[in-house]
Amino acid sequence: MPGFRDLNQRLTALLADRVRKGEVTERGLSRLTGVSQPHIHNVLKGKRFLSTETADAILHEMHLDVLDLLDPRELLEWQQRR
């Protein structure tokens, strides 16, 4: 199972992809989370990491779940271990 750093990177990649596709803007993410737009920009460029609080806020506001960041094979592997 991936750790927080890996999940953080996956969330960042997902957000960067959505920004690239025009589904959301850096400013929009800033408004949703209360985090400054420059900080969001630096996160998307890999210069900063999201705090757990900010990651949770983004997941909540974008109607995502941490499970959305997992590969289906990872979920299956986790379920088989339980």
PLM feature spans:
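Short alpha-helical DNA-recognition segment
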Residues: 21-42
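A short, Lys/Arg-rich alpha-helix, primarily the initiator
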Residues: 1-24, 28
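Residues that mark the N-terminal boundary/hinge immediately upstream of a DNA-recognition element
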Residues: 25, 51-54, 65
